[in-house]
Regions:
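Intrinsically disordered, low-complexity PEST-like regions enriched in Ser/Thr and acidic residues
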Residues: 3-42, 175-203, 339-361
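Calcium-regulated, polybasic anionic-phospholipid
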Residues: 41-83, 208-246, 366-406, 433
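Extended cytosolic scaffolds built from alpha-helical repeats
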Residues: 508-627, 636-638, 713
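Transmembrane alpha-helices of multi-pass eukaryotic membrane proteins
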Residues: 89, 250-253, 412-413, 589-618, ...
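C2 and C2-like phospholipid-binding beta-sandwich domains
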Residues: 1-17, 30-32, 47, 64, ...
């Protein structure tokens, strides 16, 4: 596979014309949108009409409004048999593409063949007023309609407002845009920008303690009882216990979301051979469940079990009922993990009572994209209907879709409160597949920015490469231009955050296991995708899954190689120090070795200088490297991800489904390759275990002669270290390590020889 050029995937600093970055514009009217370029629009708000003349035999009409500006035309919906219609519709025409000097508003009557003309009104664009927030909205006015000759008609007026503004206008999000003139009225909803909120997620704990007075179907048989606990599509089961008064005391944790839709359903089941008999059932509404905010236990309650469903809270008289002892509560002290822990955008607990005050503000300007790959074919040409999705905390934002452009300009700005700097904002770019049909939204790429890597109150304007990994290899699908500013409201609180635990206290007081967290994260992803998919326009499941990095933990050869090289890169400093020290010991540079001898003597004479010297050295290194500190935020690195040199078969394996959908021969080949890799890892792990077992065998007397020698050596060293000053021992040890090569030999040292002869448990392995 041919390797891509390095510059193609590099981060580029840009200089957009934005107020926040100090750009100078000739327009004195500015807005709060200071991280994006101003886009000029002509707005036409069509409110209503009255006393329209009839055009059919009944004296009525089916009116609608058509707004024409050059080659662009926007149309409202029509009303049947109504002479006083109300539309309240806003049209936004981009002034970058205007090729006309006036705008025409026509009122027409909907007909089967040719629509009839009712009246019109024209406006000279040079006379249209300008309005930018925080100015109050422009009040609409009544205008008498004119005929085609320009004369006033007898009856018929239209109320509308027309003004020039920017994308900061309140009418912008819900307006019809000239950029989407080819989109039908039904598809306009799917291209509008929206703000979404993730559902409030809770961990829900059920402690199944015991049952009492169970009534099995066969009275002479001791039942094998298990309890099945279900919430929505989540279900867990206790172990089997015998008897009519069984006890379990098992904990189960589920994920649920407000508003609570699914009840908690408890089934007590008796296993009779291969069949299961339900001995009792209880339904509990989650809205009635208490909430816990700390580690203090809540009291347990007895609940009646019925053969038929009994909703908790409803009054129903029963003479006798089996009971189940449960401790149920919603956990408000945990943070429900719905993202990968490496890219979390929110670390607060579920309960708002436990939230701390915010430390700052994150402002994101989504300016434009360049060179996007065509994702579909329309009229024989490749095109893209791109939109962006940004997620930080529970707030998701979606820009409007720019139809038919590989270089779209959004210029939309959004703001989030920041509660922890160790969080990540994620921006994804997608192709809208729902404009002309029900296809899926295609992924173009995404960008992650960690807030702790940003300087406060500085505006970062960069063009980020959009990179995706396909079965054919790594591919750049374009670039997205962003402006980011992290403002700090309390510098002390922000620094204090660095001393606090990453997650809420409950994660450490009562930690959940790794297996539980993985399972709960999976169900949390499903809940978030389901709730956001109900919005209008919906945020599709494929978009939510991509933003939440669903499936990121699935194994692949590429990821394993990337992590291995990351470890080697982290250890490269220690390896370099080791090589440098080896050169010192072998007198490769005599002057440096002599200086190390002098330093060693000073530190041994004054041992109290050792720790201050180490910290002073680290301080000087940090100050020295400040001059070369990173000036740009981090971005996707194909070399760090090992995506530039990955083979085709490894990529095909990475994109395989789980469980696999490949043929048996291919799976056998990959299995053999995995066995080969695992064999090498197994050898390394075995060698480490051997060294550890040799260390333990020093005093285990497995080798009696070796243990006797070691014990005798320890006794001698105890006396030597007791009577010899520490400085003398340190000097002698240092001089021995730094001795001249003429006093060295290539054979292993005595301690190494002794250690390698110690027994390990390899002899006991099959």
């Amino acid at each position: 596979m041919q390797r891509p050029p390095i510059d193609e995937f590099a981060l580029k600093e840009t200089s957009p014309k934005i107020v926040g970055a100090g750009a100078i514009t000739g327009d004195k009217l500015t807005s709060t949108y200071d991280l994006v370029e101003q886009m000029q629009y002509l707005y036409v708000r069509v409110v209503k009409a009255k006393e329209l003349p009839g055009k059919d035999v009944t004296g009525s009409c089916d009116p609608y409004v058509e707004v024409k500006l050059g080659n662009y035309k926007g149309v409202t919906r029509h009303f049947e048999k109504k002479t006083n219609p109300e539309w309240n519709h806003v049209f936004a025409f981009s002034q970058d593409r205007l090729q006309a000097s006036f705008v025409e508003v026509l009122v027409k009557d909907k007909d089967f063949i040719v629509d009839d003309f009712i009246g019109r009104i024209q406006f000279d664009l040079s006379e249209v007023p300008r309005r930018v927030p925080p100015d109050s909205p422009l009040a609409p006015q009544w205008y008498r309609l004119e005929d085609k000759k320009g004369d006033k008609i007898k009856t018929g007026e239209i109320m509308l407002a027309i003004w020039k503004g920017t994308q900061a206008d309140e009418a912008f999000p819900d307006a019809w845009h000239s950029d989407a003139a080819t989109v039908g009225r039904e598809g306009v909803t799917n291209i509008r920008g929206k703000v979404y909120l993730s559902p409030k997620l809770w961990y829900f704990r059920v402690n199944v303690i015991e049952c009492q007075d169970l009534l099995p179907g066969e009275k002479n048989r001791i039942p094998d009882v298990a309890v099945r606990v279900a919430v929505g599509n989540q279900a867990m089961r206790t172990k089997v216990a015998k008897g009519v008064n069984p006890m379990w005391n098992e904990d189960f944790v589920f994920v649920t979301a407000e508003p609570f839709e699914d009840p908690l359903v408890i089934f007590v089941e008796d296993r009779v051979g291969s069949n299961t008999e339900v001995l009792g059932k209880c339904v509990i509404m989650l809205s009635n469940v208490p909430r816990r905010f700390d580690h203090k236990p809540l009291p347990a309650k007895w609940h009646n079990l019925e053969k038929h469903t009994l909703v908790e809270g409803e009054k129903k008289e029963t003479r006798f009922a089996s009971k189940i002892h449960l401790r149920i509560y919603l956990e408000g002290g945990y943070h429900v993990l719905d993202e990968s822990t490496h890219y979390s955008s929110d670390l607060r607990p579920t309960s708002r009572q436990l939230w701390k005050s915010s430390i700052g503000l994150l402002e994101l300007g989504i300016i434009s994209a360049m060179g996007l790959s065509p994702m579909k074919t329309r009229d024989g040409l490749g095109t893209t209907d791109a939109y962006c999705v940004a997620k930080y905390g529970p707030k998701w934002v979606r820009t409007r879709s720019i139809v038919g452009s590989t270089s779209p300009k959004w210029n939309e700005q959004y703001t989030w409160e920041v509660f922890d700097p160790h969080t990540v904002v994620t921006v994804g770019v997608f192709d809208n597949g729902h404009i002309h049909g029900g296809g899926k939204d295609s992924v173009i790429g995404k960008v992650r920015i960690r807030l702790s890597t940003l300087e406060t109150d500085r505006v970062y304007t960069h063009s980020y490469p959009l990179i995706i990994l396909q079965t054919s290899g790594v591919k750049k699908t374009g670039e997205v231009q962003l402006a980011v500013r992290f403002s700090c409201t309390s510098f002390f609180n922000m620094l204090h955050k660095y001393t606090q635990p990453l997650l809420p206290k409950m994660h450490y007081a009562h930690p959940l296991s790794i297996t539980q967290l993985d399972m709960l994260r999976h169900h949390a992803n499903l809940l978030v995708a389901m709730r956001l998919g109900r919005a209008e326009p919906p945020l599709k499941k494929e978009v939510v899954d991509y933003m939440l990095d669903v499936g990121i933990h699935i194994w692949s050869v590429r990821k394993s190689k990337a992590n291995f090289y990351r470890i080697m890169n982290c250890l490269s400093g220690l390896i370099a120090v080791g090589k440098w020290f080896e050169q010192i010991c072998h007198w490769k540079n005599p002057i440096t070795t002599i200086l190390i001898h002098v330093l060693h003597v000073i530190l041994m004479i004054y041992p109290e200088l050792i720790l201050p010297t180490i910290f002073l050295y680290l301080f000087l290194i940090g100050i020295w490297r400040w001059r070369w500190k990173p000036r740009h935020p981090p971005h996707m690195d194909i070399h760090l991800s090992h995506a530039h040199a990955v083979g085709g078969d490894e990529l095909d394996e990475e994109f395989d489904t789980f469980p696999t959908s490949k043929g048996s021969d291919l799976v056998r080949m990959r299995y053999d390759r995995l066995r080969s890799i695992a064999g090498r890892i197994q050898t390394v792990v075995g060698d480490l275990a051997t060294q550890g077992e040799r260390f333990h065998s020093l005093i285990s007397w497995r080798d009696p002669r070796a243990s006797a020698l070691f014990v005798t050596f320890c006794l001698i060293m105890a006396f030597v270290l007791y009577v010899t000053p520490f400085q003398v021992l340190g000097l002698l040890a240092g001089f021995y390590v730094l001795r001249h090569p003429r006093f060295r030999h290539k054979l292993p040292s005595l301690p190494v020889n002794f250690f390698r002869r110690l027994p390990a448990r390899t002899d006991c392995l099959l």
